[in-house]
Regions:
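Periplasm-facing N-terminal accessory domains of Gram-negative outer-membrane beta-barrel systems
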Residues: 2-9, 13-142, 200, 214-216
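C-terminal beta-signal and terminal closure region of outer-membrane beta-barrel proteins
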Residues: 933-994
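Periplasmic N-terminal accessory/gating domains of Gram-negative outer-membrane beta-barrel systems
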Residues: 90-246, 265, 272-278, 282, ...
Length: 994
């Protein structure tokens, strides 16, 4: 591996400095390249090429090379006019050329001899082809698509699922319910790099997306699924490149109101209809308010744009209520409101003809109430949690043009994130009755704080046939956390209601319920705090896009990345002495993360309409800081727990004097060693996860504005993190034995995918994009970095963990379009069809509750498609085993897994009042045919099905002992605050635009 890296690195540098253009677009920008020829198809060198931003009037110019080739880098995404001038030829003007973020379209222009006509105007569709300069696999969501397609919850990233190679990912952070996670090229979604205006927007604590933005403030975004340039790092899967809107020379803006409620929505298929008939439909309403305004501060000099969005959602969660009269737990609804405020403001300033500056400030304030972490079938209203999330980000961008071939971009960025989950009810112990979880939740209070400072600088230099880029990046992350666990104490009871009087009080009440045991933090008045989980990130890169011939480009680059403290190097001396014998060698930061990247793009007919491309690259993921938090929280001291004995009864079934009761619970005897939660250590040799990416594909404009693309992608990941048990020690803090878990980078993953896209650019009143993905992937864990849920079955045979990831969709098809109809109507549909995701098959609780060791991880919907197929295995498994060790059979007719399908659409009507003012009425339907789509939320059970072989009866003599009628029953439907596929829902809206 190291030899291969060395050879590739040497090749890259040899190519890069052989001759000192095509162009890779930078983060948050676009590029443009092409050739200029005469009517005899001969190259025209030294022609003057000027591009003009039609919204702001800004211009850039260059001259063609000796081969007649021109290149522009670092252009703001916008609609441009291209003007080509050369003595002896008529001036050629190409109008309305749209440059999207991350794209480098090829625009080849033929000059005509000067005659009676001084200027020849060319339609953009006649000359704008496909990207013949880069080898990346990517797609764009443009401003028109963003504004027209129906979005449940109005999160713009929802549209990333329309592009091939991308699919929904599990939500890793239940405290951020208003974010979406994206799985690209088989990865699980913690990684990926999301940049907004070139600034990092990643959650470095748990992974995934950080801040959300008003949809009306987003201009467009690109998602590069594979093989992006050396400028972009910190991602082993995809890079999402988002651009916010900027002002123009004309004032423009609008406002809107979106509304839906329970009467406009169908009921979830998993909701008990008896409950609905008893207490009514679950109440729900959502109002969203939007506003935007932008325009010139000084025409052709300075501009501004701002956008605001507020969501007020009043929903409910199912809760349990202990009915003392009926002596049973009944189900009811408890309020679960969500309030989310989004704002972004931007100013652009052309200070001189060579200097352009941009400033952006964005804010998000989100509060929500939801159910807490449950270990019982249902929780009470007191067991909910209240999350507060605050986000602030500021970006400064300065672009200086030294000459037509040399420019520099500098970015400064600061963002602050604070999540708090305070105590929901004061002075309440959590009580886990057999059927319901009551009192203050065992996992709160919590707090996470992340502050980031980021500096990026990129120098772009076009010389000869080379488009060179050099750059560096620095990020400083300061993080701290408070994580309470059983701080208020959790009491486990044996009964939901007292069955008799057991104390001296003649009244039968809760104080007569026996206690099984009690868990409480050793230091309940001091929630564990982890300060100074900080990290410095450095990156340097060189990129050379070398146009070897006018129709053949080599993309050559190398990137170096270095994190100082993702392995807790700074706090290594604080590790508990009892586990130091398990640490091998010395701990140092991973310093050899070189990422060579090489690719090609060939336009065989040199007409800008065809691209045959491919390449190879190494891409390093970022290690989330929760890995370091695990070592510091689960260190054997920070989260010490005590387990106390429960109630003691005399021969008559009464409490003995002084025994623990709900009136005085914390008087039982501490059980030595029972409070062990495990000690996590980071392996001294842990490295940064990385993926080797290969791709080969083509793109062809088959007819004007119709583009077909197909790419094969192979990705092989190494050094991904897993937690492996390596022994145990005596822990004096708990006075007992504690297990030791080694956090190590010792597992791999694989992905093979065919990505097909057919799209039509907007013309003749319609556009569409159609995508299909055929993919297969494997990994070693349902989480690629945080080994916090379920460890490997055999710590010495990790290959037994190889299986499909929990969100793998073998087939995924999407269609979306916008169609302008007569009389001001617009129709915009989205259709999604995806195959079933796999899930684990868990042993009955009496046999341990882990997955069945003899089958692969996530075997349901892969190895076994039906209940009959699973039963054939179970019958074979049970042969020769005693009844107590046999597995129960499931229903033969059961289909394992659920195909996902949903059809959403928007129908709108615009009423124009003059040339600049309009009112738009909107109706939206999500999941028109009300198809039941079963999907979960997190990676513990993403399928949404009950996946444990729970016996119908616990008595081995009862036939129900060998039946599991509940296995495979739906637990949760898709959809929620964001996304599609949930119960059918109607939404109405009205917008004002000017």
């Amino acid at each position: 591996m190291k030899l291969a890296r060395f050879v590739l690195l040497s090749v890259v540098f040899a190519f890069a400095f052989t001759n000192v253009p095509s162009a890779f677009a930078q983060l948050g920008t676009a590029g443009l390249s092409g050739s200029v020829v005469d009517s005899n198809n001969s190259s025209v060198p030294n022609a003057r090429v000027v591009v003009k931003n039609k919204a702001t009037g800004q211009t850039r110019e260059t001259t063609t090379t000796e081969y007649g080739v021109y290149t522009f880098q670092n252009l703001p995404p916008a609609v441009y006019e291209i003007r080509v001038e050369m003595q002896g030829f008529a001036t050629a003007v190409v109008d309305n050329v749209t440059l999207n973020v991350g794209q480098v379209p090829s625009v080849n222009i033929t000059l005509q001899p000067k005659g009676t006509t001084e200027t020849v105007t060319i339609a953009a569709g006649e000359v704008v082809g496909v990207d013949t300069s880069t080898s990346q696999v990517s797609g764009q969501i443009n401003e028109r698509t963003l504004a027209s397609l129906p979005l449940n919850g109005r999160n713009f990233l929802d549209l990333a699922y329309l592009l091939p190679g991308n699919a929904p990912a599990p939500n890793y952070d239940p405290t951020k319910t208003t974010t979406l996670e994206i799985s690209s090229a088989g990865q699980l979604g913690r990684g990926g790099n999301i940049a907004v205006d070139g600034a990092d927007n990643n959650d470095d604590v748990v992974g995934g997306t950080l801040q959300n933005f008003p949809q009306d403030g987003i201009s467009e975004f690109q998602i590069a699924t594979n093989r992006f340039s050396a400028e972009i790092g910190r991602s082993a899967s995809s890079a999402i490149n988002v651009v916010t809107k900027s002002g123009s020379n004309d004032f423009h803006g609008g406002g809107g109101f979106y509304y839906r409620n329970s009467r406009l929505s169908a009921l979830p298929a998993t909701l008990n209809r008896t409950l609905v008939s008893t207490i009514g439909r679950p109440p729900f309403d959502r109002e969203q308010y939007t506003a935007s305004f932008g325009g010139p501060i000084r025409r052709e000099k300075a501009w501004f744009f701002s956008a605001f969005e507020y969501r007020n959602q009043d929903g409910v969660v199912l809760v349990g209520v202990r009915d003392f009269n009926a002596r049973r737990v009944v189900t009811s609804f408890a309020p679960a409101p969500l309030n989310d405020l989004l704002f972004t403001g931007r100013a652009d300033w052309q200070t001189t003809s060579d200097d352009r500056m941009a400033f952006r400030y964005s804010l998000q304030r989100e509060d929500d109430i939801d159910r807490g972490s449950l270990r019982r079938p249902i929780g009470t209203a007191d067991n909910r949690q209240h999350s507060f999330n605050r986000y602030h980000s500021f970006v400064y961008n300065w672009t200086h043009t030294f000459s037509s071939r040399l420019l520099n971009e500098f970015v400064f960025h600061e963002n602050k994130f604070l999540n708090q989950i305070p105590t929901f009810v004061e002075n309440r112990n959590e009580i886990r009755f057999p059927s319901v979880q009551d009192g203050g939740n065992f996992r709160i209070p919590q707090r996470t704080r992340q502050n980031r400072l980021q500096f990026r600088d990129n120098l772009s230099w076009t010389t000869g046939n080379h488009a060179m880029k050099f750059g560096f990046e620095f990020q400083r992350l300061d993080t701290d956390a408070i994580f309470d666990l059983f701080g208020s104490g959790t009491i486990f009871t044996t009964e939901d209601f007292a069955t008799r009087n057991r104390d001296t009080n003649p009244t039968i009440n809760d104080n007569d319920i026996p206690i099984a045991l009690i868990i409480r933090s050793v230091a309940p008045n001091r929630p564990p705090t982890v300060p100074n989980v900080d990290n410095n990130f450095y990156a340097f890169y060189v990129q050379d896009d070398w146009k070897v011939r006018p129709n053949f480009t080599l993309n050559l680059g190398v990137r170096y990345e270095f994190d100082t403290n993702t392995k807790n190097v700074k706090n290594f001396g604080d590790i508990f002495s009892i586990v130091r014998p398990f640490l091998r060698g010395t701990r140092n930061s991973d310093k050899n993360n070189f990422s060579p990247r090489v690719g090609f793009n060939w336009d065989p007919w040199n007409d800008g309409r065809t691209s045959i491309h491919g390449g190879y690259g190494i891409y390093y993921d970022r290690i989330v800081l929760e890995v370091a938090l695990l070592e510091r929280l689960l260190d054997g001291r920070a989260l010490p727990l005590e387990v106390r004995t429960g109630s003691v009864l005399d021969a008559n079934g009464n409490f003995v004097p002084g025994t623990p009761t709900l009136a005085n619970p914390f008087v039982g005897t501490i059980i030595p060693g029972a409070g062990a939660v495990g000690i996590n250590i980071i392996d001294n040799n842990m490295g940064t996860p990385y993926v080797q990416q290969y791709n080969f594909g083509f793109q062809r404009e088959v007819f004007r504005d119709y583009i077909l693309a197909a790419d094969y992608i192979h990705a092989f990941g190494s050094s991904f993190i897993i937690g492996r048990g390596i022994g145990s020690v005596f822990n004096p803090v708990i006075n007992g034995t504690d297990s030791v878990v080694n956090l190590e980078s010792s597992v791999k993953n694989w992905y093979d995918g065919l990505l097909v896209n057919f799209q039509k650019r907007f013309s003749h009143n319609y556009s569409f994009t159609m995508s299909y993905t055929l993919a297969k992937s494997f990994n070693f864990s349902n989480d690629d970095q945080i080994p916090f849920q379920v460890g490997p079955l055999d710590n010495n045979r990790l290959r037994l963990e190889k299986g499909p990831p929990p969100n793998e969709e073998r087939h995924r098809f999407t269609f979306a379009g916008t169609f302008d109809l007569p009389y001001g109507f617009e129709f915009a549909p989205i259709y999604t069809l995806a195959s079933a995701v796999p899930f684990d098959i868990q042993l009955p609780p009496d046999l341990g509750g882990t997955r069945i060791p003899q089958i692969q991880r996530n075997a349901a919907a892969r190895t076994f498609k039906t209940g009959a197929e699973l039963n054939a295995f179970i019958n074979q498994y049970n042969t020769g085993r005693p009844t107590a060790q046999r597995l129960p059979l499931v229903l033969d007719s059961l289909d394992l897994g659920d195909i996902f399908t949903s059809f959403d659409f928007r129908l709108s009507k615009k009423f124009n009042f003059g040339e600049r003012f309009a009112i738009q009425g909107i109706g939206e339907i999500f999941n028109l045919f009300n198809v039941t789509n079963i999907r979960g939320v997190n990676n513990v059970n993403y399928s949404g099905f009950q996946n444990t072989l729970i016996r119908d009866n616990e008595n081995p003599a009862n036939p129900g002992f060998l039946r599991s009628s509940s296995f495979g029953t739906p637990l949760q439907t898709a959809g929620g605050v964001f996304g599609t596929g949930g119960p059918r829902a109607f939404q109405i809206a009205v917008r004002v635009v000017f």
